[in-house]
Amino acid sequence: MTKYVVNNSTIDSILGWIKAGEIAIPEIQRPFVWDSSRVRDLMDSLYKGYPIGYIITWKNPDTKLKDGTVSLGKKIVIDGQQRITAMTAALLGEEVIDSDYKKKRIKISFNPKEERFEVLNPAIEKDTEWIDDISKLFKHGFNMFGFVNEYCALNGIEDTN
């Protein structure tokens, strides 16, 4: 009898689990300890298609979670909490609880011309070549066509249809 199964899952699948509340962090996991530059580096690795390591989950119906509830059959994160939390922060725009137990919003920016990620700062915020917060690209109802047209207009890029 198999004790475990290895699945290859896409980032889209993992984000779907997070949005649907199907994945949870157990009470025993530590707070989020990555700094913003490490989150930026993870986004860069994902963009370039580099492997980011395993994320190990376990289905257990009665594991106590960080929010005080019980897992009720959700996927419990055993290894990969920092990476999942980083993706949740950068791609879904959710706040994280840092090592001082304070809520913090991490905004990662992207420059399509240079294909480069950075942590949002005041200079980037004013520069139209940068997408100031990549999480807006993943919001429900996001209008990609309108966004691309606006980006091109702001940056003097002609429509190449």
Each language-model region and where it sits:
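Basic- and aromatic-enriched surface patches that contact anionic nucleotides/nucleic acids
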Residues: 2-161
